Amino acid sequence: MRITIQEYVVNEIDSGPYGITVGKDGALWFTEQKGNRIGRINATGEINSFPIPTANAGAMSIISDQTGDLWFTEYNSSKIGKMSMNGLFEEYVLPTTNAAPFGITEGPDGAIWFTEMNNGRIGRITKSGEITEFELPNSKSFPSFITLGSDGALWFTQNQNNRIGRITTKGEVKEYPIPTPNSGPVGIASGPDGAIWFVQIIGNKIGRITFEGEIKEFVIPTPNARPHAIIPGKNRDLWFTEWGGNQISRITVEGVITEYTIPTNNAEPHGITFCPDGDLWFAEECNQIGRLTIIT
């Protein structure tokens, strides 16, 4: 498979792009974790930014819901943010202080689900702003990314508890220990094979877990690659960012890994998403947005 990578510099210096998603308008929307803005980039590379009302909010992960609204986590301010396509913001304060919300996804019930890193909880917010929090067995588990599984449950990584968690829309929780000790799971996604896939930022592996809890692990070729985010691909594969390896990588459902080097050194890639046209876009904390095009 041949690819090309283009990179677009964000207008504002030291904006710190982190999360990224495809909007209903076809553009890419991303969080500027350091710049305290939500950014938008179109297919030609034109970038606009929208300041977040709360100062130093620490915007991290971002999604676009079925109606087109953008939802994002505010790690520093313990809020969930909502933004319309025309730049109107609403912010919802979490009941728990210093919750550090991080991962976010839309649930099968139409609500938005998110993780609370600092207090070991999974949160749920309705489109009208009503918030419910579910406590995990270990309050120090550091839940990170979260995704919707094809079984209708929400699956999440527990970075400091070395487990993959599963929570139903009723709040019922199950946990599955990862074979590699202290693996540091972070990104998680529902794969094209129906299983749940996740990255191990310390274990340097990609993991796969079935709904029965059976886990397989695949070693990343580059040492200390520090994989971060992962998403399903278009050809029975998944793609993930290597924060330490400075690469965008592909893993097939059979576990074969291919790595592609980012042109900019120390780009610090984090969030990653696919556009409908098949291009893959990713956020680089070095103040750029990357675009990977598959040639063959």
Curated annotation (Swiss-Prot):
SUPFAM superfamilies: Calcium-dependent phosphotriesterase, NHL repeat
Names of the cofactor(s): Mg(2+)
Record-annotated active site: 270 (proton acceptor)
UniProt: Mg(2+) binding residues: 268, 285
Domain of life according to the entry: Bacteria
Pfam families on file: Vgb_lyase (PF24684)
E.C. number(s) listed in UniProt: 4.2.99.-
Keywords linked to the UniProt accession: Antibiotic resistance, Lyase, Magnesium, Metal-binding
GO biological process: antibiotic catabolic process; response to antibiotic
Signal peptide segment: none
GO molecular function annotations of the record: carbon-oxygen lyase activity; magnesium ion binding
Keyword presence, Magnesium: yes
Top EC class, one word: lyase
Family under the similarity heading: Belongs to the Vgb family.
Function in brief: Inactivates the type B streptogramin antibiotics by linearizing the lactone ring at the ester linkage, generating a free phenylglycine carboxylate and converting the threonyl moiety into 2-amino-butenoic acid.
Subunit structure: Monomer.
HAMAP family: VirginiamycinB_lyase
The name this protein goes by in its record: Virginiamycin B lyase
Species of origin: Bacillus mycoides (strain KBAB4)
